[in-house]
Structures are given as C-alpha cells and as structure tokens.
C-alpha cells in the first residue's frame, strides 16, 4: 500500500510539473511599453536599495499576473496588462490562466 501511494503521488507531481511547464503564462508574452516604464519607475524609486527593488518588481510581476483575470484588482491593471485590460485581445485569450479563470 505504501509503494502504491508513493507511486501515485510521484505520477501526480510529474503531471503537475509538465502541465505547469507547458501552460502559456503572461510572462511568455512580450512586455508592453507601459509595463517596462512601471518597472523603470520601481527601480528608480528604490534608490539603489536592491531589497526594495526586488520587492517592488515582485509586486509588479504578481499584479501583472493577477490582472489577467481580474482587471478591477488595482487601478493600474490597464498599464500592467494592456493586452487584457480593459478589453481582452487574442494574445490574452490564449493564456491558460484566462481560459481557466
């Protein structure tokens, strides 16, 4: 019974990894100019503090990912994901998070 459980969860984990790797994510699309400007502002506002810069860039990345399915999440969603907000174009509709969301 123990071996079967381990085999089952191993197969489940491998399936999850393969599906996640093959999924089309917002990070796979080219970055729009408005998102690049937001990243530059985040780096500028950090004033050379690498930790603050990392936190700001992670925050932007997470908001960009979450804005694909919910344009009302933050007011800057149209700047972070212009391909999805306010109207979803073909590039956005191909994303797996939008299809499943």
UniProtKB/Swiss-Prot annotation:
UniProt GO molecular function: potassium channel regulator activity; toxin activity
Gene Ontology cellular component terms for the protein in this record: extracellular region
Signal peptide feature range: 1-23
Compartments it resides in: Secreted
Keyword Secreted: yes
Function as written in the Swiss-Prot or TrEMBL entry: Voltage-gated potassium channel inhibitor.
Family per similarity comment: Belongs to the scoloptoxin-10 family.
Protein name stated in the entry: Kappa-scoloptoxin(10)-Ssd1a
Organism annotation: Scolopendra dehaani (Thai centipede)
């Amino acid at each position: 019974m123990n071996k079967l459980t381990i085999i089952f969860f191993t197969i489940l984990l491998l399936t999850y990894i393969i599906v996640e790797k093959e999924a089309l994510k917002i990070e796979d699309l080219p970055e729009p100019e408005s998102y690049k400007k937001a990243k530059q502002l985040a780096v500028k506002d950090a004033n050379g503090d690498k930790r603050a810069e990392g936190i700001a860039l992670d925050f932007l990345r997470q908001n960009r990912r979450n804005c694909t399915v919910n344009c009302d999440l933050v007011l800057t969603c149209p700047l972070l994901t212009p391909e999805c907000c306010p109207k979803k174009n073909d590039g956005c509709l191909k994303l797996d998070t939008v299809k499943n969301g």
